[in-house]
UniProtKB/Swiss-Prot annotation:
InterPro entries, A to Z: Chaperonin_GroES, Chaperonin_GroES_sf, Chaprnonin_Cpn10_CS, GroES-like_sf
Protein name as catalogued: Co-chaperonin GroES
Origin species: Jannaschia sp. (strain CCS1)
Family in the record: Belongs to the GroES chaperonin family.
Gene Ontology terms for molecular function: ATP binding; metal ion binding; protein folding chaperone; protein-folding chaperone binding; unfolded protein binding
Gene3D superfamilies named in the record: GroES chaperonin (2.30.33.40)
GO cellular component assignments: cytoplasm
Localisation per UniProt entry: Cytoplasm
Taxonomic classification: Bacteria, Pseudomonadati, Pseudomonadota, Alphaproteobacteria, Rhodobacterales
Job of this protein: Together with the chaperonin GroEL, plays an essential role in assisting protein folding. The GroEL-GroES system forms a nano-cage that allows encapsulation of the non-native substrate proteins and provides a physical environment optimized to promote and accelerate protein folding. GroES binds to the apical surface of the GroEL ring, thereby capping the opening of the GroEL channel.
CDD domains from the UniProt entry: cpn10 (cd00320)
Gene Ontology biological process terms from the UniProt entry: chaperone cofactor-dependent protein refolding
Keywords: Chaperone, Cytoplasm
Length: 95
């Protein structure tokens, strides 16, 4: 099933964090924080100004992004957990 976000919303797949520390310690699932890094799966067309003019999206499908800890709404699609968020919830694009 495909899902196309509307307006300035973005569908994001979380990128899992490392399972080991730099020193080689394995981090148990219970101690891991939810990752705040992800990959853009799909984007809406953008927001609209009061005049009706389209404001194009800054991010695009495939971009690797950084977002706030509490950003977005969790969505399950075909058994995969994704996040739906507004473009303004994105802190930056990782290059």
């Amino acid at each position: 099933m495909a899902l196309k976000p509307l307006q300035d919303r973005v569908l994001v797949r979380r990128v899992e964090s490392e399972e080991k520390t730099a020193g080689g310690l394995i981090i148990p699932e219970s101690a891991k924080e939810k990752p705040s890094e992800g990959e853009v799966v799909s984007c809406g067309d953008g927001a609209r100004k009061d005049s009706g003019e389209l404001i194009e999206m800054t991010v695009k499908t495939g971009d690797r992004i950084l977002f706030g800890k509490w950003s977005g709404t969790e969505v399950t699609l075909d058994g995969e957990e994704l996040l739906m968020m507004k473009e303004s919830d994105i802190l930056g694009i990782i290059t």
